[in-house]
Amino acid sequence: MPFVMAIDQGTTSSRAILFRGDISIAASAQQEFPQHFPASGWVEHEPEDIWASTLATCRAAMEKAGATAADIAAIGITNQRETVVVWDAASGKAIHRAIVWQDRRTAEVCTRMKADGYEPMITDKTGLIIDPYFSGTKVAWLLDNVPGARARAERGELKFGTIDCWLLWRLTGGRVHATDATNASRTLLFNIHTGDWDDELLQLLRVPRSMLPEVKDSSAHFGDSAYELFGAPIAIRGIAGDQQAATIGQACFSPGMIKSTYGTGCFALLITGATPVKSHNKLLTTIAYQLGGKRTYALEGSIFVAGSAVQWLRDGLGIIKHASETGPLADKSDSMQSVYLVPAFVGLGAPYWNPRVRGALFGMTRNTGPAELAHAALESVCYQTYDLWAAMRADWSGADAAPPVLRVDGGMAASDWTMQRLADLLDAPVDRPVIQETTALGAAYLAGLSAGVFPEPQKFADNWRLDHRFRPAMSQATRERKLAGWGRAVKGLLASDEGEG
């Protein structure tokens, strides 16, 4: 039985996982790489670190499984979205560090674009809003701030890509410059209705079309790896951005199904089907996947700080040594205290979209200690998810206007404390699957589908298995009181920004 190898290139580490044909995991490898913070609100990665860690983990996973290139039917790639690399087309060398999705350096540019009235047009075409989060203004910044970059781009000497595109270029030895529709849909340059790069958007951001990759289906033959990498070529047959890949790995194929992934940030996607639904509550309209030339759309809510709030407890405050300690510590908190953390460390994402505000704690007393801070950090993830859930309920008219169950995955989904509190605040069941490597599984599925290893989507969905269902156990009065307190905390933070303005 052949393997399918999934490359899961994330914000803090690169992983490779070998899946068997029955979707069980044969082997995996992971390698972290450095983060760079050259200025307040700036986040960068070295593109060579991303490539080196990806190649190393692929080789390590193959070695653990005793697999050769001949044993692998296909490679699937999933990646941190929106992160931008620009490189020299001839040498393959990046002209600057990658600008990461969390980076906020283009906030002033985005503010000016909004003031100039461009947002309605951009939202209509892309399903997105004007925000530093997305790739377009990052590319423009590189062209304007790296000496000679704009002239080189206009001469056709530079290539642009999200991380999937960069890895595909390196895997194929510089032979293939392509991406898939899910990654393209996150750039602020792609028209999600026509399925092509948009000339009006390219002109607005002054990005030459010659820089841009070909856009393909999420499940397709993108190219073959260079012979010298693995001892023989391996076909690369699937690509999707990490959140779309997780949606596929969670078998969310029917309209109304929703998943939420908890990694560095939190990202909820609700499948809306073949027709894009325009949000009236500051959610994003995005492409969930594209198969056989047909696009399936989703509503998405993006939260910038989820697991990184726990990292802050560990690395910033030093009150825990391991993330697994957070839930037991939160259990010890004083129930008489109502401490709220609004973790706007890099601004607020959906549904507020304010890149200027910064994090704040509300409700602290003289007795507030580590347990209360741990409690507030974990609850902040649940409150932010509630905000997305409420917005989705308001926007989605199918399935009685409310997704009945939330499927969860990612590192924080392993925290029973957090998942139970999430069910309590949503007043809805929260389902955690047996296979929690859903992002990698989604990438593997796309590749395996193209290679003929995995079945069509609905048959694949039959393989989804429940590990645990968390049911709401909080009284309505307590839920309403806690949500009202969160609402006041967010309102207070946003008011402080207005006061400074």
UniProtKB/Swiss-Prot annotation:
Q: What does it catalyze? A: glycerol + ATP = sn-glycerol 3-phosphate + ADP + H(+)
Give the EC number(s) listed in the UniProt record: 2.7.1.30
Q: Which InterPro entries match?
A: ATPase_NBD, Carb_kinase_FGGY, Carb_kinase_FGGY_CS, FGGY_C, FGGY_N, Glycerol_kin
Q: Name a biological process GO annotation.
A: glycerol metabolic process
Q: Which residues bind sn-glycerol 3-phosphate?
A: 11, 81-82, 133, 242
Entry binding sites for glycerol: 81-82, 133, 242-243
What does this protein's UniProt record list under function? Answer: Key enzyme in the regulation of glycerol uptake and metabolism. Catalyzes the phosphorylation of glycerol to yield sn-glycerol 3-phosphate.
Q: Which NCBIfam families match?
A: glycerol_kin (TIGR01311), PRK00047.1 (NF000756)
Can you say what this protein is called?
Glycerol kinase
Name its species. Rhodopseudomonas palustris (strain HaA2)
